[in-house]
Amino acid sequence: MIDFLTENDIVHINERTARAHGGKFEPPTNYLHEEALVYLVEAAGSEVFGAPMYPSPSDKAAHYMFSIISNHVFQDGNKRTGLQAARTFVQLNGGAFHKKLKAVEVDGRRVPSEGKGTKDIWFYLTMEMAAGAVSLEETREWFKRNTSW
């Protein structure tokens, strides 16, 4: 059984990251686009024509990260929140990230385009996602190849 993140879980992650890293948090929720959060939480477990929108746990983790970052759910801290939400989802569901994260080739393109070593890979993946340079499909492939379940 999959443990999904709730709206409250994600708001709490945003609040924790804002307090830990000096970001802005406007109580009670810090929303910029509440409807985007409602949709992403619902979509994580949804089906289309009887098939899951995000069939694997790695697809779901990618969805959380990509949707929070690209849809600017919060007034501040979307990159940190998206990253931490994905990491939390993986951990909650018994998955793990590989000790040494790597860039992956997707349709002849390196994702992320820069970075060596785990810290750099996280940084560039997150920044490129925020800049619109990484698609959801590329994010899904990256998570598939960098997680174990």
Which residues make up each language-model segment?
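FIC/Doc superfamily catalytic core
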Residues: 1-149
